[in-house]
Amino acid sequence: CLVLFAALFCGALYCSTNSNEKAVWYFSSNCEGKLNSLSHIPKNTLTGYDSLMIVAHPDDETIWGGSHLLNGNYVVVCITNGNNKTRRREFESVIKQTGSIGIMLTYPDKRLGKRDNWNSCKTEIEKDVAAILKMNDWQTIVTHNPEGEYGHIHHQMTSELTTTAVSDREQLDRLYYFGKYVKA
């Protein structure tokens, strides 16, 4: 069931719940306006979740961190594709099957058929990642490795943005990267 919570600036926030009573939170916006909607997630939603995974695209959580999702209560943040219905359904399915909580942002993956470089929204992504890090006392924070696994620019940028935000919070001892899950 979809519940519309608020129309916020250039977008909307809504929640899709599943039979496990876990949720996927969506933030629909474009990069031209600041979206302070993360504060609308009820604080008790994160109770019992101390692991955070930040990925660039839906399916990255499965490809690079799937076995970890099966073994822990993760909050999975996906930076792109909140506006793509198929990718949303796939993400919801993974979240449901693993008992995780999902937060899907809607920063662009592609514009006019070309990979977006996030220049127009990098500051907004940085602010959203910082806000998510402040939402809980994360014991484990997982993201793409600095090389972007196979050189994908969004994976590299997600790694850089997450690493910087974690460093700013002096929590590098909690940061792990995909690949070999090398401790940062």
Where in this protein do the model-derived segments appear?
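Hydrophobic membrane-insertion alpha-helices, especially the h-region
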Residues: C1-L13
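Active-site rim/loop-helix segments in enzyme catalytic domains that contact anionic ligands
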Residues: A12-N136, T163-T164
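Conserved acidic residues
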Residues: Y49, Q139, D173
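Short, solvent-exposed loop/turn segments at secondary-structure junctions
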Residues: N81, D109-K110, E147-E149, V182-K183
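Proline-aspartate-enriched helix->loop->beta-strand connector
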Residues: L133, D137-E147
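Short, well-ordered beta-to-alpha junction loops that form the rim of enzyme active sites
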Residues: T143-E147, I153, K180
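Short Gly/Thr/Asp-enriched flexible loops that form oxyanion-binding sites at enzyme active sites
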Residues: Y150-A165
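Short, flexible loop segments at boundaries between secondary-structure elements
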Residues: S167-A184
